[in-house]
């Protein structure tokens, strides 16, 4: 009887030890699995895969964005990104139109947008280089986050550098299409009006910022399309990362 009890007790101890060992093994296996992200089509994704996929989506966005915005009416014909006069020049537009000089205002606004369309052609290499050189911190979080998360990350991390590189391109386009001349015409006309506060916004800075705004809007649209529309995932990497 004592032998039977001892045997039973020993067996229980062995079973418990075996079970704990199996449990530890199971926990390790599960832990290894949850360190990676899974998608229906790709299996496991590494941080490097996700980073490369986000960069590819952004590169595609700028390529399509440049193609769209550099067309005639790319800026001027799109109400979402059409460049108006600066907010601090609202009184200029209102006053000049009331004095019958609306055509000068219209010409200034149109030439401002034509300059942005012309400058867009020179944006591609500048933006693509910024994307390639971008270090994506916490790529997994960006992937799982907002539909424009990669675009917002790009803007936050590269906008200042993009502005400095893109500004000379915009300046050249402003001069090329006559926007600088038209800008000076309306503000000179306004500043000659008696009793008005003189206004003279910085054309190059304003135009560069607004042109960049339009490009980021287009990049965000492409990112959204890639995330939501499987047909937009035209490469193996995009299919792997975005499912």
PLM feature spans:
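Bacterial N-terminal signal peptides that target proteins for export
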Residues: 1-7
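Bacterial N-terminal signal peptides
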Residues: 8-16
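Sec/Tat signal peptide C-region and signal peptidase I cleavage site
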Residues: 17-21
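N-terminal Sec/ER secretory leader and immediately downstream segment
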Residues: 24-109
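A cross-kingdom marker for long, charged
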Residues: 29-33, 204, 211-243
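Second-shell loop/turn segments in exported
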Residues: 43-54, 97-99, 108-117, 127-128, ...
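Mid-length scaffold segments of soluble, non-membrane domains
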Residues: 101-173
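An amphipathic alpha-helical core segment
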Residues: 165, 169-210
């Amino acid at each position: 009887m004592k032998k039977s009890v001892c045997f039973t007790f020993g067996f229980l101890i062995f079973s418990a030890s075996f079970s704990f060992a199996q449990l530890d093994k199971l926990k390790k296996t599960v832990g290894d699995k949850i360190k990676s992200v899974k998608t229906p089509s790709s299996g496991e994704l590494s941080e490097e895969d996700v980073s490369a996929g986000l960069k590819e989506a952004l590169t595609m966005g700028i390529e399509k964005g440049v193609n769209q915005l550099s067309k005639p009416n790319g800026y001027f014909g799109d109400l979402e990104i059409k460049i108006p006069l600066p907010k601090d020049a609202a009184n200029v537009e209102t006053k000049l139109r009331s004095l019958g000089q609306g055509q000068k205002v219209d010409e200034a606004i149109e030439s401002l947008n034509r300059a942005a369309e012309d400058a867009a052609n020179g944006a591609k290499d500048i933006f693509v280089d910024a994307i390639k050189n971008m270090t994506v911190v916490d790529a997994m979080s960006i992937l799982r986050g907002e539909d424009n998360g990669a675009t917002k990350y790009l803007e936050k991390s590269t906008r200042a550098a993009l502005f400095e590189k893109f500004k000379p391109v915009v300046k050249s386009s402003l001069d090329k299409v006559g926007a600088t001349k038209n800008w000076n015409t309306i503000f000179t006309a306004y500043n000659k009006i008696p009793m008005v506060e003189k206004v003279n916004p910085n054309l190059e800075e304003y135009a560069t910022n607004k042109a960049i705004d339009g490009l980021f809007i287009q990049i965000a649209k492409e990112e959204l399309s890639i995330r939501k529309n499987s047909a937009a995932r035209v490469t193996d990497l995009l299919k792997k990362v975005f499912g």
